[in-house]
């Protein structure tokens, strides 16, 4: 049944995006952001379309749409489908969306680790279209959340903005390089699918402990440091990391940084079957920023996660997680 609802919302977004794309001669992904804003504002004037006929057709779509009554997950999933359509020609791994199954699992972890918090502040420093953040926000059980997202790509940011409005999420957006100074108060939790690769701004990297001694620094190392800096003492960070994170030439500094600044709580390897290319396979790393009343767990939660479609194996794994939480938290 949910599939039908998601499909109906997708059709509304897709039809509007195609019309706007053709009329304004812009990319589908840019048109999708405009379509999202149109549905939120419930008007078409801001589009300044050249053809009256298209304005009337969009008006008819607006009259058909009832975004105020749609479940938030329908809207998020519909946007996800439309974004995938618009990005199918973009092969850069750092511009791919975090798969739903992983987003839902990270939501489960956030709820477990932040169980005692009724109000949360959340930062995603590599927001993209916001899919991971909105997945987590939609799954927060009985918690209110103020969230912050940083994204350097203005088109992706516009899509996140359109979704935040339609999902009625309190989200502050920052259009900037996440590794430049951030004017954000420390948050309770950070979630991030780390962009992997080299950071080209050597001068900017000089401000970081985890800068390379020579040559370009790893962006994913700098993202970790920036995230820890903007987390409250005792706060948690949930990263999707490349499986080779601790094997690189720059990993010595990273290990020392972890020892000095955080407690590693969990390292969970994701099923390789999720990833098209095993070279891009990832794990989930859970850190706690050190503070006066924090201590490292007696035992780090280490696991190779089974396929998410294997329900029995996942239930067994979650039972093991519950045991770990009873002992350590």
UniProtKB/Swiss-Prot annotation:
Disulfide topology: none
Pfam families, alphabetized: N6_Mtase, YtxK_like
InterPro entries xref list: DNA_methylase_A-5, DNA_Protect_Modify, S-AdoMet-dep_Ade-MeTrfase_prd, SAM-dependent_MTases_sf, YtxK-like_N
Domain of life: Bacteria
Cross-referenced Gene3D superfamilies: 1.10.150.470, Vaccinia Virus protein VP39
GO molecular function, one term: N-methyltransferase activity
Similarity comment: family membership: To type I restriction system adenine methylases.
Name this polypeptide is given: Uncharacterized protein YtxK
Protein source organism: Bacillus subtilis (strain 168)
């Amino acid at each position: 049944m949910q599939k039908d609802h998601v499909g109906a919302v997708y059709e509304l977004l897709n039809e509007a995006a195609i019309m706007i794309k053709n009329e304004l001669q812009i990319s589908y992904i840019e048109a999708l952001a405009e379509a999202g804003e149109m549905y939120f504002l419930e008007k078409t004037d801001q589009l300044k379309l050249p053809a009256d006929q298209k304005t009337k057709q969009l008006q008819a779509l607006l009259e058909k749409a009832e975004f105020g009554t749609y479940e938030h997950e329908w809207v998020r999933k519909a946007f996800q489908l439309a974004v995938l359509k618009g990005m199918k020609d973009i092969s850069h791994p750092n511009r791919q969306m975090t798969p739903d199954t992983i987003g839902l699992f990270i939501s489960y972890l956030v709820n477990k680790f932040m169980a005692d918090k009724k109000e949360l502040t959340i930062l995603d420093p590599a927001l993209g279209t916001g899919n991971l953040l909105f997945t987590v926000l939609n799954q927060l059980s009985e918690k209110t959340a103020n969230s912050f997202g940083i994204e350097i790509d203005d088109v992706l940011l516009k899509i996140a903005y359109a979704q935040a409005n339609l999902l009625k999420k309190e989200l502050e957006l920052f259009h900037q390089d996440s590794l430049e100074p951030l004017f954000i108060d420390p948050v309770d939790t950070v979630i991030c699918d780390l962009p992997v690769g080299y950071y080209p701004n050597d001068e900017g990297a000089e401000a970081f402990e985890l800068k390379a001694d020579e040559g370009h620094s790893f962006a994913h190392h700098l993202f970790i440091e920036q995230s820890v800096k903007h987390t409250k003492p005792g706060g948690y960070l949930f990263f999707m990391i490349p499986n080779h994170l601790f094997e690189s030439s720059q990993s010595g500094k990273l290990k020392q940084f972890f020892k000095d600044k955080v407690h590693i709580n969990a390292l969970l390897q994701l099923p390789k079957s999720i990833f098209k290319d095993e070279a891009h396979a990832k794990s989930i790393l859970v850190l706690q920023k050190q503070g006066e009343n924090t201590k490292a767990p007696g035992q780090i939660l280490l696991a190779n996660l089974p396929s998410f479609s294997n329900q029995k194996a996942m239930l067994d794994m979650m039972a093991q997680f519950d045991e770990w939480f009873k002992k350590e938290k």
